[in-house]
């Protein structure tokens, strides 16, 4: 067992480590510079290069302290070397720049695709269409240490005053010779509504939640030793799924948005299609990328100075007064109907598994009784139990004397599973009525009398009275023959037992042949008239054995039928009282099991065995304890109480967990099913509602009051 626990603990630790590494890698992958530089070559930073970088950063910090033309100092750029700064990233790429309005003598921002980098201002004149760039990573922006063969080591040999001057240079050759000035108003983080547009739809989190539901289900059917581990795993999966769906984004996950002011213009030909027209709008040298559904509304801002918020990848988040992704999500929330569908389907799956694999009757009853506050009842008499007022969910501890029940209408056979058949000691009849008398039967007495008469004559004993002298009997025995010395008695006892014509047919025919009579009725008349008194019949041993077997087979049905009838006659308890039953079929009496089941006895022995069993079980001590699962009163006034064994602590938790899981799955399936339907309907009309909203904002309809028309 310890090996299994160690293995599970190691597996859990490895899983947590793998998740942590995956999160670290995904966090690195979410950084804007990682995807841009991941295919670049790298090398180690040389000591002289590091010295040049440190000197440049020192001079940069000194220059930033010098007030500008308006008397304000430049905003400090915190470039600090870190452990990753020892690796130089080498790549060939174009450099994009745009201007800002600031007191900083360096009025340009430089980008490699969507990654902003810090370029020493004295290298602006060396920018080409494709640039050989070497840079290192700092705590804030990547720092360019070499551009097209120019390095910071050369800068150390030149005048320090020249280093950060506003050098007169030509425009970057990437976008042409001239570009319009763009004013950088602000740099902000995207709002939660804007972040929601790039956030996944939550399908992965929905699958995690469904996986947690399945783990909770398997907790109900696995051994106790694994349950804590599975519950812990299910809680972790559920927490991870809910956190992914509802947790606010971290600050590091929110991307930067640059708030710009400039004049957007369209550069293109008249023959371009709609998609090309929406993608050929520029703000200065920045090519803007608009949402597709903004196409009808962006033309009114062309050629006019407009406030535009963009991501570093040039996607527009806001333009003008009305076009805003933030307002879209706020007024028309995203409808993630797919994740609700997945959770609803998963909940239904677990619910069906509960219905088909786990009995739900007992968990529901136990949970409801536990919530209602069930009572514990101890009783040793019928009156005590009557006063207690038994309800479903109560715990009973009963002891006393009662009768094992006999089911009505049952077919008593050897295949029945009760060791006390025909009595069922998993059900006890408990009342104050006097015990029933032992059953009696005239037919059984007649059958036994016939069997005894034949047996006495076929197997005589020396002390038995006989109408034949001892010497004659001895001579007959020596000859090998068998003597019936009272044949008339056998005929009369057979007629008394088998009164109907269709009963004991073979035995009657045999006796007719032995009596040398015309038919059975004639033979009976002769016997009644005393004409068979003193008639002796000699039989060969084979004939004697056949006669004995015929008597046995003829009397057996009478005895078996009377045994069953007598058992049914005992199934008539007095009105009132209780019938205490174990719904698991457990025996409620402490009696030794019979060595041989009743119906395994020969027919001639069943009656005596039944009487012994009845004498023991009609008034026998019993003890019963358990939780009441059902209570009802029959037409005879007997109160039927079904008991289930008292579960242990683990069983209680399983019952409670089964009920809670079933209720949770029902609520989850209904709620998420309704949400999926409603969200799907809203998702289909969301884009049309957004366009209608923009139409009402950009092209308002004026309604004229009828009073103004007068």
Swiss-Prot record:
Keyword list, A-Z: Cell inner membrane, Cell membrane, Membrane, Transmembrane, Transmembrane helix
Highest rank taxon of the organism: Bacteria
Listed transmembrane segments: 2-22, 205-225, 226-246, 340-360, 657-677
InterPro entries: IgaA
Membrane topology listed for this record: Multi-pass membrane protein
Location relative to the cell: Cell inner membrane
Periplasmic topological domain: 1, 361-656
Cytoplasmic side: 23-204, 247-339, 678-710
Gene Ontology CC entries for this record: plasma membrane
Family according to the record: Belongs to the IgaA family.
Listed name of the protein: Putative membrane protein IgaA homolog
Taxonomic lineage from the root: Bacteria, Pseudomonadati, Pseudomonadota, Gammaproteobacteria, Enterobacterales
Gene this chain is encoded by: yrfF
């Amino acid at each position: 067992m310890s090996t299994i626990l160690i293995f599970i603990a190691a597996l859990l630790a490895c899983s947590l480590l793998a998740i942590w590494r995956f999160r670290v890698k995904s966090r690195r992958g979410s950084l804007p510079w990682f995807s841009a530089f991941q295919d670049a070559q790298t090398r180690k930073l040389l000591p002289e290069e590091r010295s040049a970088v440190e000197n440049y950063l020192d001079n940069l910090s000194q220059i930033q302290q010098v007030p500008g033309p308006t008397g304000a100092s430049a905003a400090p750029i915190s470039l600090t070397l870190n452990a990753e700064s020892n690796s130089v990233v080498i790549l060939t790429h174009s450099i994009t720049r745009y201007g800002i309005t600031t007191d900083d003598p360096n009025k340009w921002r430089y980008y490699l695709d969507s990654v902003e980098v810090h370029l020493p201002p004295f290298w602006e004149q060396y920018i080409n269409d494709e640039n050989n760039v070497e840079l290192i990573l700092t705590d804030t922006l990547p720092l360019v240490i070499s551009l097209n063969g120019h390095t910071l080591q050369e800068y150390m040999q030149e005048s320090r005053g020249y280093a950060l001057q506003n050098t007169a240079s030509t425009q970057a050759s990437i976008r042409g010779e001239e570009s319009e000035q763009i004013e950088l108003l602000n740099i902000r983080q995207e709002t939660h509504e804007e972040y929601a547009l790039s956030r996944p739809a939550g399908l992965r989190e929905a699958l995690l939640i469904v996986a947690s539901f399945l783990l909770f289900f398997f907790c109900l059917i696995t051994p106790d030793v694994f349950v804590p581990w599975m519950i812990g795993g299910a809680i972790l999966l559920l927490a991870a799924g809910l956190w992914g769906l509802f947790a606010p984004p971290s600050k590091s996950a929110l991307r930067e948005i640059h708030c710009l002011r400039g004049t957007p213009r369209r550069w293109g030909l008249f023959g371009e299609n709609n998609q090309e027209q929406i993608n050929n709008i520029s703000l200065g040298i920045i090519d803007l990328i608009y949402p597709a559904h903004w196409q009808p509304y962006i033309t009114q801002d062309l050629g006019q100075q407009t406030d535009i918020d963009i991501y570093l990848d040039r996607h527009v988040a806001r333009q003008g007064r009305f076009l805003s992704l933030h307002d879209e999500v706020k007024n028309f929330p995203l409808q993630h109907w797919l994740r609700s569908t997945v959770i609803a389907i998963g909940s239904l799956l677990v619910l069906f598994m509960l219905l088909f694999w786990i009995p739900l009757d007992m968990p529901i009853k136990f949970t409801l009784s536990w919530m209602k506050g069930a009572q514990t009842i101890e009783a040793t008499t019928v009156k005590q139990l009557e006063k207690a007022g038994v309800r479903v969910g109560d715990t009973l501890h009963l002891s006393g004397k009662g009768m094992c029940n006999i089911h009505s209408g049952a077919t008593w056979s050897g295949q029945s599973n009760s060791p006390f058949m025909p009595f069922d000691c998993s059900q006890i009849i408990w009342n104050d009525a006097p015990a029933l008398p032992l059953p009696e039967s005239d037919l059984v007495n007649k059958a036994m009398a016939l069997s005894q008469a034949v047996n006495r004559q076929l197997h005589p004993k020396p002390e038995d009275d006989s109408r034949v002298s001892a010497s004659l009997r001895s001579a007959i025995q020596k000859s090998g023959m068998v003597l019936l010395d009272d044949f008339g008695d056998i005929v009369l006892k057979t007629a008394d037992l088998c009164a109907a014509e269709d009963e004991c047919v073979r035995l009657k025919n045999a006796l007719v042949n032995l009596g040398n009579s015309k038919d059975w009725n004639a033979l009976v008349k002769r016997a009644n008239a005393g004409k068979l008194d003193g008639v002796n019949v000699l039989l060969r041993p084979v004939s004697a054995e056949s006669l004995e077997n015929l008597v046995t087979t003829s009397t057996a049905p009478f005895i078996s039928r009377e045994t069953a009838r007598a058992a049914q006659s005992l199934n008539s308890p007095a009105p009132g009282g209780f019938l205490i039953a174990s719904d698991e079929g457990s025996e409620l009496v402490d009696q030794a099991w019979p060595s041989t089941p009743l119906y395994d006895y020969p027919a001639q022995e069943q009656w005596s065995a039944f009487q012994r069993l009845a004498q023991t079980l009609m008034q026998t001590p019993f003890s019963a304890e358990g939780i009441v699962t059902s209570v009802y009163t029959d037409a005879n006034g007997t109160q039927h109480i079904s008991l289930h064994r008292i579960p242990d602590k683990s069983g209680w938790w399983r019952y409670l967990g089964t009920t809670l899981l079933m209720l949770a799955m029902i609520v989850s399936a209904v709620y998420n099913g309704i949400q999926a339907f409603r969200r799907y309907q809203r998702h289909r009309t969301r884009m049309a509602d957004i366009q209608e909203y923009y139409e009402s904002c950009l092209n308002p309809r004026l309604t004229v009051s009828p009073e103004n028309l007068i």
